[in-house]
Amino acid sequence: MKRSLRKMWRPGEKKEPQGVVYEDVPDDTEDFKESLKVVFEGSAYGLQNFNKQKKLKRCDDMDTFFLHYAAAEGQIELMEKITRDSSLEVLHEMDDYGNTPLHCAVEKNQIESVKFLLSRGANPNLRNFNMMAPLHIAVQGMNNEVMKVLLEHRTIDVNLEGENGNTAVIIACTTNNSEALQILLKKGAKPCKSNKWGCFPIHQAAFSGSKECMEIILRFGEEHGYSRQLHINFMNNGKATPLHLAVQNGDLEMIKMCLDNGAQIDPVEKGRCTAIHFAATQGATEIVKLMISSYSGSVDIVNTTDGCHETMLHRASLFDHHELADYLISVGADINKIDSEGRSPLILATASASWNIVNLLLSKGAQVDIKDNFGRNFLHLTVQQPYGLKNLRPEFMQMQQIKELVMDEDNDGCTPLHYACRQGGPGSVNNLLGFNVSIHSKSKDKKSPLHFAASYGRINTCQRLLQDISDTRLLNEGDLHGMTPLHLAAKNGHDKVVQLLLKKGALFLSDHNGWTALHHASMGGYTQTMKVILDTNLKCTDRLDEDGNTALHFAAREGHAKAVALLLSHNADIVLNKQQASFLHLALHNKRKEVVLTIIRSKRWDECLKIFSHNSPGNKCPITEMIEYLPECMKVLLDFCMLHSTEDKSCRDYYIEYNFKYLQCPLEFTKKTPTQDVIYEPLTALNAMVQNNRIELLNHPVCKEYLLMKWLAYGFRAHMMNLGSYCLGLIPMTILVVNIKPGMAFNSTGIINETSDHSEILDTTNSYLIKTCMILVFLSSIFGYCKEAGQIFQQKRNYFMDISNVLEWIIYTTGIIFVLPLFVEIPAHLQWQCGAIAVYFYWMNFLLYLQRFENCGIFIVMLEVILKTLLRSTVVFIFLLLAFGLSFYILLNLQDPFSSPLLSIIQTFSMMLGDINYRESFLEPYLRNELAHPVLSFAQLVSFTIFVPIVLMNLLIGLAVGDIAEVQKHASLKRIAMQVELHTSLEKKLPLWFLRKVDQKSTIVYPNKPRSGGMLFHIFCFLFCTGEIRQEIPNADKSLEMEILKQKYRLKDLTFLLEKQHELIKLIIQKMEIISETEDDDSHCSFQDRFKKEQMEQRNSRWNTVLRAVKAKTHHLEP
C-alpha cells in the first residue's frame, strides 16, 4: 500500500486511471493527495479532522508514510500526533530504501526532528539497505550539528560499521570533514579500527587527499603513544601504506605531507611494488623526483625492484614515459638491469613500441646484445613492430653493435630476418638484407626466412627474398618435416604466394608424410590455391601419400565440397587407400553431407560408386554405407532416380520413369560361389534400409515401385503357389473334421467303427470323398517334410531360430497320424487328439501366410505383439491363479468346480475371464447355509474381483493399447520389411536365368492412366494394398537455387574487378610516390581467413590512410 501510494505521488507524474472503473466507490488517490497536502501545510488539527472524516482503514501504514515526510520537513506537531496515535514500532518502519524517519531527518538536516525522534525512543543504530546509519549519513553530508545531537544520545554506537566496514571516522576522512572527525574522536571513536579491506582512517585520508583529517589523525595518535612515523606507515590487507594510496591518487601535496611525517618509500605491497614504482608507472616525474630527493635510506632506491624484478626505468619504458626515463638515467638508473623474464629496459620498451624510450636508451649507450628468456635481443623485437627498423634513428642503424645482431639467433634458432619475414615488413627486410644477411639461415626446425614469409602469406617479402637468388635451392629446401615454402603457402591458402613460388621454379615435392602442396591445400579447402596448382601441374592430382591417400581423400575427409568438385572436374583419379577406402567412403564415415551431395550431383558419380573393394570389412558398397551413415543423401539419390516427363502433370500422357539401378547389385554378385567369400544378398539396399530402420527411405516412391515390380514379376506367383500347396493340406483336413463324427475310427475297409459296442455302415456317398481327403492330407504332409528338410539344408542354423518351422513340423506330424488308419490300425483316441492338434495349428499357421498381404498382415503383427505381452505377464497370472485357486479350494471344496486343487485353479482361471458364477458358487450356498466360512469366502471374492477383473485386466488392456500404438507407428517399416524378406528369400531360391528374364532395371508409370495387369493385378490390389500405391514427390522449386547461383557468380565477378582496381591503385600510389601505411601491410589472407577476421572485429578500411596521404600531397602541391 505504501509503495503504491509513493509511486502514485511523484513530481511531474500524472497518471490516468486504468482498468475497470467502479461507481459509488471512494477514490483513495484523492484522499491521499488531500492528506499529503495537510502534511506539507503542517496542520496537526487538519490531519486529525481528515482522519476522522475519511476513516482510513490502514491507519498505521498511512501514519508510517506520513512520519517520514513529517520528519524530513521538520513538522513536529504532526510527528507528535502520529506517534501519539501509533505504536512505538512506527519510529522504526523503513521505506523502500531501508530508511527510518530518523534517517530522513538526518539527511535533511532537521535538528528538531532528530531530537524529537530520539526522545520518543528512535534507535540511532539502525542501518538502511546501504548499511548506512544516521551517524554515517550526518558525517557524509557535513551535517555536523545533527551529528552532535546524535552523539549526545546514550545508545549511539560511535564505532558502528557501515558499508564495507567503514566507520564514521573513515567516512569523515573520506569527505575531509575535519570538524566531524574531531568531534568523533572526542566522543571516543577509534581511529585504529579498519574496514573490510584493512584500511585505517589514515589510509582513507591519504587516498582522498584529506590533509586536515590526516593531521588530526596523526596528532591524535601521537597523543596516545603512536609516533607519526609509525602511524604513517600502517599497512592494509594488501600491505599498502598511506603513501601507496597517496601516489595512486596523484596528490603531490599529500605525498609531500606523508614524506614529511616519516613515510617510508621502500615498503612493498602484495604485488611487490613500492610507492615509487606506482609513481613511475603513472609517469609522474615530479612525484618521483620528490620521493627520490626525500629518501635517506641505504638502499639504492632508484634501482630497487618490484616482484617482477622490474625497476622504475622498466616501468617508465613500458609506457613510454621518456621524460621520467631521462631523469632516472640522470640520477643513476641502471639502463641494463634485467627483470624476471630477462628483459632489460631496452627490450621492454621495444616490445611495447615505446620508441622514444628506445632511442633514448640507445643514445645513452644501452647494451643491445642482452637477450630475454626466449633468446630474443632488441633487434628481434624491433622488426616485429609496425614500421620495424624505421622507428629507429638512422645513426643507430650504422652502429656496429647493431649490425652484429642481424645473425643472432633466439632459442628456436630464428634470426631477426626470420622475425621480419613472419611479420611481413618489407622495409625491415630491406634494411636487414642491406647488412648482407644470409637468406639461407635456418632455424632449429630447419626453416629459412622464405619458409616464414610463405607460411604467413607475405607476398612482398617473398618477392624481395627471391629477387636476387641465382638458383632454386632456397625454393625447394624442406624443413624438419620436409615441407618446402610451397607446402607452407598451400597449407595456409596463400594462392598468390603459391603462384609466385611456382613461377620462380618451385617443384612439386612431397614432405616426409608423402603430402604434396595439393594435399595441404585440399585439406584446408583452399580452392583458389588448388586452381593455381592444378593450372600448373594437372598430374599432381594422383599423387599418393604414405597411406595411399590422394588430395581427394583429404578434401572429402575434411568436408570441403568445393574442393572435391574442383578435383573431380580436373579428372582426379579415384583410387582406394591402404585401408581400402575411397574418398567417398571417408566422406560417408565422417558424415560430410555436402561432400556426398556434391559427388552425387557430379558427372562422375557412377565412377565413384563403382570404386570399392568387395573384400573390405569396413569399407563396403557406398550405397549401403550411405544408407547407414547419411540417409538424407540416399534420399537425394533416389530423387534423381525419378525422371518426370516434360508433359503437364494433368496430361494423360504424363509419366514418371523409375530407375532401380542403385537398389540392387548386379544379379551375378548374388549368385557367386563362395570361393572368393564375396556373396551379396538380393535386395541389398532395401535390406540395409530395414536393418538401419530407414523408414523414410523405404517409403520413397522408387522403393515402393521397386517392390511392386518384384511382386508382380515373381513374388505374387510364388506366394500364391506356396499358399496353394499349403491349402492342399488345410482344406482336406478341414473336410475330414467336418464330415467325420468325432470318436469314430476309419479303417482301410471303408467301415467306420464307433467306439461303443454297436457299429454303423459307412455312407457310401461320402466314403470316396473322405478317402481322397485323407490321401491329400498324407501327401501334403510328406511334401511338407521334404520342403522343411530342404530349408534346413539351405538355412542351416537360422532355420531353428524361426518358431514357425516348429509349427510346420507339428502340423505335418499330427496330420499323418490322423490319416494313418488309412494304412494301419491305431487307437481312435490318439487319432482324434492328433486331428484336433493338426486342424488347430493348420489354421493358426495360415495366419502367418496372410502376413504377406498388407490388408490383414498388419493386424497379424499386432496379434503377435499382444501375444508377446501376454507371455511376459504370465508370471503374474501364475501366482494369482495359485493364490486364489488354492484359497477357493479350501473355502469352497464342497462344490464340484472346487473339489480338487487342479479343478479349483481351472475354475479360478475361468472366473478370471469373467465367468465368476456368483449365484451358483456363492449366493445360493450361502442361503442354504452350505458355506463353511461365509465371511472369509465373500472377502476373498471381493479381493479376487478387485485384483483380477479390474486391476489385472485393465493393466493388460493398457499394455495392449500401448503396443498397438507402437506397432501402428512403425507399421510401414514392418510391412515393407516383410515384403523385403519375402523377395530376398525368393531370389535366393530362384535360378539366375529366371531372374534375368523377369527383373527390370527401370519402369515407366503413367499416373493418369489405369494400370494394366488384368485379373492378377486387381487381385493383388485388393489383397495387398490398403491405399494409394505410390505417393508422388513434388518437383523441387529450382528458382531460388538458380537465383542464388546467379548472385554467386556476380559476387565472383565483383571480387575479380575489385582485385584489379586494388592493383591499379597500388601502381598509381607508387607512380605518385605517396607513402602510406599500406606499403608496410604485407599480408595476404584467403577469403576464409578474411571472413573470419571481419566477423571477429570491425575496423576502418586501410585505404583511409591512402586517401589521407593523397589529400596531404594535394594540399602540399597547391600554391
Swiss-Prot record:
UniProt binding sites for (E)-cinnamaldehyde: C414, C421, C621, C641, C665, K710
Record-linked SUPFAM superfamilies: Ankyrin repeat
Positions annotated as ANK repeat: 62-92, 97-126, 130-160, 164-193, 197-226, 238-267, 271-301, 308-337, 341-370, 374-403, 412-441, 445-474, 481-510, 513-542, 547-576, 579-609
Result of altering P394A: Loss of answer to hypoxia and hydroxylase inhibitor DMOG, but not to AITC and hyperoxia
Gene3D superfamilies per the UniProt record, alphabetical: Ankyrin repeat-containing domain (1.25.40.20)
Annotated positions of the 4-hydroxyproline modification: P394
Protein's name in the database: Transient receptor potential cation channel subfamily A member 1
Gene name linked to the record: TRPA1
